[in-house]
């Protein structure tokens, strides 16, 4: 069972429809017990970083997400949800994030139109489970004005938009997609299937303990 965290700032409907399409078991929730009972977690997000962190704090979800990370449960952040996984952001004001991934969220420094919106090529930087079954150079759908300034060793895929934009990041059981898999057609569905596979593998490992 995958928990989609509903904190009032996510693209919940499209993520829900995508999981339904691939046949994944899921629940949309902000309940701490349900999140911790799940086998994997998706943190979606649309909007401003400081507001999102305020809402997560108000709903006591920051400690839950950190516990999810600590116990090794697979966690996937999408768009703003990915950005929240990092240590801090400069959006609107200096603001602390969840601190589950090293790095900071910064404004895109490009001469191109901001937000970066539309389809872009995703190039492989290193292997990780969410690349399974994907062709290097597949096109995915972006909508964002900020990017993750983070260590190279956690960057698994990049896109060019006047600069290299980390599209895929990962460290241990924590995964992030700056683009929207749920809006990226069959490529996106494969990515979500791959995450579903990671979740099932983690669930099986817990049953054998």
Swiss-Prot record:
Catalytic site positions: 79, 180, 182
- What subcellular compartments does it reside in? Cytoplasm
Q: Which InterPro entries match?
A: Class_I_gatase-like, GATASE, Imidazole-glycPsynth_HisH
The UniProt entry, under Pfam families, shows: GATase (PF00117)
Q: Which Gene3D superfamilies match?
A: 3.40.50.880
Listed pathway(s)? Amino-acid biosynthesis; L-histidine biosynthesis; L-histidine from 5-phospho-alpha-D-ribose 1-diphosphate: step 5/9
Q: Which UniProt keywords apply?
A: Amino-acid biosynthesis, Cytoplasm, Glutamine amidotransferase, Histidine biosynthesis, Hydrolase, Lyase
Q: Which domain of life is it from?
A: Bacteria
Which Gene Ontology terms of cellular component type are present?
A: cytoplasm
Gene Ontology molecular function, alphabetical: glutaminase activity; imidazoleglycerol-phosphate synthase activity; lyase activity
Enumerate the CDD domains for this protein. GATase1_IGP_Synthase
Biological process according to GO: L-histidine biosynthetic process
Where is this chain primarily localised?
Answer: cytoplasm
Q: Which reaction does it catalyse?
A: 5-[(5-phospho-1-deoxy-D-ribulos-1-ylimino)methylamino]-1-(5-phospho-beta-D-ribosyl)imidazole-4-carboxamide + L-glutamine = D-erythro-1-(imidazol-4-yl)glycerol 3-phosphate + 5-amino-1-(5-phospho-beta-D-ribosyl)imidazole-4-carboxamide + L-glutamate + H(+); L-glutamine + H2O = L-glutamate + NH4(+)
Where do the Glutamine amidotransferase type-1 domain residues begin and end?
1-205
Q: What is its EC number?
A: 4.3.2.10, 3.5.1.2
Q: What does this protein do?
A: IGPS catalyzes the conversion of PRFAR and glutamine to IGP, AICAR and glutamate. The HisH subunit catalyzes the hydrolysis of glutamine to glutamate and ammonia as part of the synthesis of IGP and AICAR. The resulting ammonia molecule is channeled to the active site of HisF.
Whom does it interact with, and what assembly results? Heterodimer of HisH and HisF.
Full protein name: Imidazole glycerol phosphate synthase subunit HisH
């Amino acid at each position: 069972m995958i928990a989609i965290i509903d904190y009032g700032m996510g693209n919940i409907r499209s993520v829900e429809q995508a999981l339904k399409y691939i046949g994944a078991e899921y629940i949309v929730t902000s309940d701490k017990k349900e999140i911790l009972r799940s086998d994997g977690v998706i943190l979606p997000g649309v909007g401003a970083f400081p507001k999102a962190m305020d809402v997560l704090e108000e709903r006591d979800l920051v400690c839950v997400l950190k516990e999810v990370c600590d116990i090794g449960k697979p966690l996937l952040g999408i768009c703003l949800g990915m950005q929240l996984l990092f240590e801090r952001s400069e959006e609107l004001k200096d603001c602390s994030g969840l601190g589950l991934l090293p790095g900071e969220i910064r404004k895109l420094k490009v001469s191109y139109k901001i937000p970066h919106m539309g389809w872009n090529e995703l190039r492989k930087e290193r292997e990780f489970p969410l690349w399974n079954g994907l062709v290097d150079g597949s096109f995915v759908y972006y909508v964002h004005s900020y990017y993750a300034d983070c260590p190279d060793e956690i960057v698994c895929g990049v896109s060019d938009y006047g600069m290299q934009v980390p599209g895929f990041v990962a460290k241990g059981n924590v995964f992030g997609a700056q683009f929207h898999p749920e809006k990226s057609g069959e490529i996106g569905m494969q990515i979500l299937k791959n995450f579903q596979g990671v979740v099932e593998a983690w669930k099986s490992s817990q049953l054998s303990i």
